[in-house]
């Protein structure tokens, strides 16, 4: 799940691009078809753009969504059908791992496209705009440090539990006491990662700032290298905590799903069916891929 921490605002772009369409809202297609507008609003929070620049950015985002709709969404439908079939005899660790690995690989492909979009578009901005962008990242860093570093252990574990309950109940409905206990018991084994995550983010933001301030013509390649090497520069404690928490997360999901009631099972299958239907509708309504805008 290394894609959960992305550079240059890409994490939230990725969330908009993939997870927003899985957010459980009543209309997946409605949200997906308006992602260009939503992403545009988000980018304007980081840098001031002219009308021509906004139009250029929207064109690039449209091309990204065309690619995602044509080449990625069909696989989502297959995975969801396979996942539903695996529920019949009780979900196994191997089956859950397969789905999670598929999603991570898909997220990595989208992450690469988002990174290309941001760097290529960034190359069209002025030096002043790029500095404005990185200063906003630094402001975000300060807010993240204030939010997470002051959090107590009790608050941290409570947040973890609430997030799991919220995400799982969205697909299952009200959780049973046994399911809630499974979440509470296993999430208590989590190793705090927020301190390490904030430190890791601060490191690459500082590296990016140095590159952008120098304004070297090769800054796009340097920025890309910062991202691609970010994992190599992480402290071993970060990687160990991340791996541990990933295992625990999968244990929680497996335990809760396999304790589902017949009512929860019906709801889960109904939700899976809705996503498959929505994804198929999006695929059918897709536009031809703009390969020039994607840089292909």
Residue ranges of model-derived segments:
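C-terminal motif of bacterial Sec signal peptides marking the signal peptidase cleavage site
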Residues: 21-24
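Bacterial signal peptide processing site
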Residues: 26-29
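Start-of-domain marker
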Residues: 31-68
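A cross-kingdom marker for long, charged
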Residues: 40, 205-296
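Signal peptide-directed extracytoplasmic domains
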Residues: 74-106, 116, 134
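Extended amphipathic alpha-helical interaction segments
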Residues: 118-238
């Amino acid at each position: 799940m290394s894609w959960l921490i992305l550079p240059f605002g890409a994490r939230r772009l990725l969330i908009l691009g993939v997870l927003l369409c899985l957010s459980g809202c009543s209309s997946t297609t409605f949200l997906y078809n308006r992602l260009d507008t939503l992403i545009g609003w988000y980018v304007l929070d980081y840098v001031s753009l002219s009308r021509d620049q906004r139009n250029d950015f929207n064109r690039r985002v449209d091309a990204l969504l065309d690619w995602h709709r044509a080449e990625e969404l069909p696989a989502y439908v297959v995975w969801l059908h396979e996942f539903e079939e695996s529920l019949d005899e009780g979900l196994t660790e191997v089956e859950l791992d397969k789905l999670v690995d598929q999603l991570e690989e898909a997220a990595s492909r989208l992450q690469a496209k988002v990174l290309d979009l941001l760097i290529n578009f960034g190359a069209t901005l002025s030096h002043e705009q790029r500095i404005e962008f990185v200063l906003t990242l630094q402001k975000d860093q300060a807010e993240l440090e204030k939010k997470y570093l002051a959090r107590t252990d009790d608050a941290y574990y409570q947040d973890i539990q609430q997030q799991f309950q919220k995400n799982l109940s969205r697909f299952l409905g009200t959780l049973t006491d046994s399911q809630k206990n499974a979440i509470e018991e296993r999430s208590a084994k989590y190793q705090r990662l927020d301190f390490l995550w904030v430190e890791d983010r601060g490191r690459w933001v500082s590296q990016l700032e140095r590159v952008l301030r120098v304004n070297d013509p090769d800054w796009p390649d340097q920025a890309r290298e910062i991202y691609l090497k970010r994992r190599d520069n992480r402290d071993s404690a970060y990687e160990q905590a991340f791996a541990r928490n990933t295992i625990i997360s999968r244990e929680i999901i497996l335990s809760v799903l396999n304790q589902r009631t017949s009512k929860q099972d019906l709801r889960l299958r109904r939700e899976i069916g809705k996503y498959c239907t929505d994804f198929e509708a999006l695929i059918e309504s897709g536009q031809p891929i703009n390969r020039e805008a994607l840089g292909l």
